[in-house]
Regions:
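S-adenosyl-L-methionine-dependent methyltransferase catalytic module, highlighting the catalytic core
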Residues: 2-6, 28-40, 150, 159-199
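Conserved N-terminal segment of class I S-adenosyl-L-methionine
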Residues: 2-140
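Local beta-strand N-terminus motif with an aromatic residue
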Residues: 92, 146-147
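Histidine- and/or cysteine-centered catalytic micro-motif in compact active-site loops
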Residues: 101, 125-126, 154, 183-185
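GHKL-family ATP-binding catalytic core of two-component histidine kinases
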Residues: 140-142, 159
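A short beta-strand submotif of the Rossmann-like class I SAM-dependent methyltransferase core
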Residues: 148-154
Length: 199
């Protein structure tokens, strides 16, 4: 593990998450200037870099974090899925983005703009990046009040995932649904469509 990987690992393990979220948007892109190159292209920010930064709390993963927009592998995969396999970006559905990732949040804010900003809702337990703050197990939104929920890498961290899933089901408008976060290794066409009866 190189010095950058060690520095990132130390930072992740010693700086409180809310503070880290406030400063990472400035610090990492400055570090990214050292990674100017053409070998990698981030599908979220469109920037080319020599390589992605290592990232991880334990053993940092190589080539994980975009030094320009802070997107991780799972964020880039989700964005590609949204762009290529959904019609989310063709309109302005009410979208609840739980624990919004910095890079994805920027893209959605650009898409929704000021005219449709009320249709893009960000929420988190404590992140300063979110508009609303709540526990996903007790969502303070009305029944059937959102069209889409993006909840990436969260359910494995809650006390009662079944309760959280019931809450997500409660706030979603009725109709066909697809998972917002495809599991790596599955072809997009193989993703099942969830209907009211199968939820």
């Amino acid at each position: 593990m190189g010095i950058v990987g060690k520095a990132i690992k130390w930072t992740l393990n010693h700086i409180p998450r809310p503070l880290l979220q406030k400063v990472a948007g400035l610090g990492v892109p400055m570090l990214g200037m050292l990674y100017i190159g053409r070998e990698r292209k981030c599908p979220i920010c469109g920037k080319r870099v020599r390589e992605f930064l290592p990232y991880g709390y334990g053993t940092p993963r190589k080539d994980a974090l975009c030094p320009r927009c802070l997107a991780l592998e799972r964020h880039r995969l989700l964005w590609l899925y949204i762009e290529r396999e959904t019609d989310l970006l063709k309109g302005y559905p009410t979208l609840l983005h739980i624990a919004p990732e910095v890079a994805l949040k920027r893209k959605f804010e650009q898409h929704y703009g000021t005219q449709y900003a009320e249709h893009y809702i960000t929420a988190d337990l404590e992140s300063p990046l979110a508009k609303m703050h709540f526990d996903i197990q007790d969502i303070p939104l009305d029944n059937e009040s959102v069209d889409i929920v993006i909840c990436n890498h969260i359910l494995e961290h809650v006390e009662d995932d079944r309760k959280a899933l019931r809450e997500l089901h409660r706030i979603l408008r009725q109709g066909p649904r697809r998972p917002a976060s495809p599991r790596p290794g599955r072809a997009p066409g193989a993703l099942p469509t969830f209907t009211t009866g199968s939820r």
